């Protein structure tokens, strides 16, 4: 009953949020949405998902690993560091995402493919770029098929608090929610690149990583 109520609450947040949209600016550190706005409804849904995520059996609880990844994320996030909460998830695929409320998910499959700290910084910088540009709410407002969002939210809701395959479904739902347009991906790349290079990491690291990931993707086709 709890998970069903959670799914209904998230769906209601989605539908209520579709009704209104205030003009957006890039995130300033410590920004919170206006009460009653569509963005506040999306934050509410993500806050609920985050509460359940903290109990996930897939959450990696190694303090040293979490501190290290958060440390790199904070360096690229700069003034936004205090807004971030990083969760490392034990999932073998390459993925990272960041919700508008500051929740960042980082899958261990990315660690298997990243060769050095500079590449890690580019992945994290890319996600903080999505966050500072507020791509999640922009994407939400642009979605014409609300059922796609409802399906993704229900994957999150019904996977929350469960184990095994259901938890993987939840994470798949989170990934679906934060699947952005090519223009948004390019903007996040540019924002991440500027942040990473400003911290002194190699400017070629991101291109090297994406090239390897593209080749890996081609081998699956």
Each PLM stretch: what is its role?
Residues 1-7:
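Bacterial N-terminal signal peptides that target proteins for export
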